[in-house]
Regions:
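Solvent-exposed, non-transmembrane regions of membrane-associated and secreted proteins
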Residues: 6-197
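Short, Lys/Arg-rich N-terminal segment immediately upstream of the first membrane anchor
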Residues: 1-5
């Protein structure tokens, strides 16, 4: 075997190892995100004492309205999101950072009250990976910490570029959910309107 053949075999082995390592890393991050969300949900759903000790009233900087926020592990949550057709229930963080997305979906913009809530989440299996499987008419349920339940209906699903921030935030939709496509080049965007509160 010549020098180039050995070089390409070595390069191929390195690429296989790198790909396998990346797969393990991504699956580990997905697992950790799912575990973190489940722990927070358990506290929210089962531990009333801890919740009552951690409830604070926060003024939403986007709306200047008061909202009930629960602080768990130094992160503020505004409620939960449930998508029955995906068998998914997750806590919602009150604000967005990339680090917080590793724990749960985050409010990116707006509020329930102003009917312009935008929630983003990673495309982890345990978070928003399957948003593209939603269909028109599917339900999305958000519950806040005043125990108000808001039921939304999926109206449309669209694909936006990551730079289409203005389009993401515009429109006459009461709720928008979004996550990355599997290749991370675009955003799966689910538009919903409130049908019951």
């Amino acid at each position: 075997m010549n020098k180039f053949g050995k070089y390409f075999i070595f390069l191929g082995i390195i690429l296989v190892i790198f790909s396998f390592s990346l797969l393990i890393y991504n699956n580990l991050k997905d697992y950790q995100a799912g575990k973190s969300s489940k722990e927070v949900l358990k506290i929210i759903e089962e531990d009333d004492k801890q919740i009552n000790e951690n409830i604070i009233t926060n003024v939403n900087n986007l709306t200047n309205k008061e909202e009930k926020v629960i602080n768990i592990n130094n992160n503020n949550y505004i409620g939960t999101i449930e998508i029955p057709s995906l068998n998914l229930k997750l806590p919602i963080m009150s604000d967005f950072t990339y680090d917080k997305l590793n724990i749960s979906p985050c409010r990116y913009f707006g509020s329930i009250e102003t009917k312009d809530l935008v929630i983003c989440g990673h495309a982890y299996r345990t978070h928003f990976k399957y948003l593209a499987n939603l269909e028109q008419g599917d339900l999305v349920i958000i519950t806040d910490f005043y125990n108000n339940t808001y039921i939304y209906e999926v109206l449309e699903i669209e694909i936006l570029k990551p730079t289409d921030i203005e389009e993401m935030l515009s429109g006459e939709f009461d709720l928008t959910l979004y996550t990355c496509t599997s290749d991370s080049k675009n955003r799966i965007t689910v538009r919903c309107n409130l049908i019951s509160e």
